[in-house]
Every structure is written in C-alpha cells, then in structure tokens.
Amino acid sequence: RSTGWIPLFAENNQEAYDNMVQAYRIAEHKDVRLPIMICQDGFITSHAVENIELLEDDIVKTFVGEYEPEHYLLKDNEPFAVGPYAVTNYVMEAKRAQMQGLRNAKQVTLDVAKEFEKISGRSYGLFEEYRMEDADYAMVIIGSAAGTGKDTVDMLRKQGVRAGLLKIRLFRPFPAEELSLIHI
C-alpha cells in the first residue's frame, strides 16, 4: 500500500494483455503519475497457451499516445533529482501527492476503460460482477480463480443456490465504496 503502485489483476491472458494496453494511459495520466503492475497468476496463466485477440499496433499506438512528461530529466536550465530517497522535510509532501494520485486512479481507470471498450469491444471496470443481481451469497476473487469461481456459481445456481461472484480488478486503490453499493 505505501509503495504507491497500482495493481491491476487479470483473470486470463486476454485481460493481462488488455490491462497492459490500458496501464500506460492510467499511469501516465497527469492526475495519477504512479507506476502500475499488471498482476496475473504465475504459471496458471503466464505459462498457459491461450488464444487472445490482439489489437493492431497502430490502434494501440494511437490509444496509448506519445509520452508527454511533466518534467524532462536533462534540462540544464531546470535541474531536479528523481529517486526513491526523500529527506524528512519532503516525505509528507511526497506521500500526500502519492495518495492523491491513488485516489484519482479510480476515475482515471474507469475513463480509460470506456475509451478502451470503443477500440476493442471489451468492457472493464474496477471489478466484475457475475450473476450478482439476486445473489444471497457471493465469492470475492482475484485472478485466474475467477474462471473456476464462475463455473462454481453456475453449478450452485442449478442447485437452487443464489450465488454470485465479484472479481476484483483494481486492488489499490481498493474500490470499497463502489463494492458497498452492490446487491447482496
């Protein structure tokens, strides 16, 4: 949490690819400017052979856009230092900026996902709801276990159990307020 990284989780290789394309836009957004990690289950998905739909390179390049840094590192008339070390009198300012970027990441993630849907036809949010509309029980899952979880929900539904699934995509900042609005 205190590192300031934004973890985006993927259920499968398609989501890992899609998250990677979106991650550049989220991380480089002027209201975020924080690193993102694309999280996928080691071996379960990382070593799996799975078909995915790739976007054309020119479409991805247009979507991601050119990197436009707020500050260039090598400007002799505007020198500044970059690094993980912060002296005592700067720590609070740095942490405050980091936390503000994390707070902003929720809306930026949703905005980028809407734009991504226009070019890919694939929709993403902060989390995915599966059969939650009338669920009495819900599984909360991250990563590749969601596929098995969805099959389990379907089996439970056939047995008359009103089960559902919530798959977390954006883990930090955690979408607690948004999750609290879901029916269960």
Please report, for each region that a protein language model flagged, where it lies by residue:
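Redox- and metal-dependent alpha/beta enzyme cores, enriched for Fe-S-associated oxidoreductases
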Residues: 133-161, 174-179
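Conformationally flexible catalytic loops at phosphate/diphosphate-handling active centers
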Residues: 35-128
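A general structural motif
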Residues: 108-124, 141-149, 168-176
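Conserved thiamine diphosphate
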Residues: 1-35, 39-42
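A generic structural motif
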Residues: 36-41, 162-171
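Conserved small/polar residues in nucleotide/adenosyl-binding loops
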Residues: 182-184
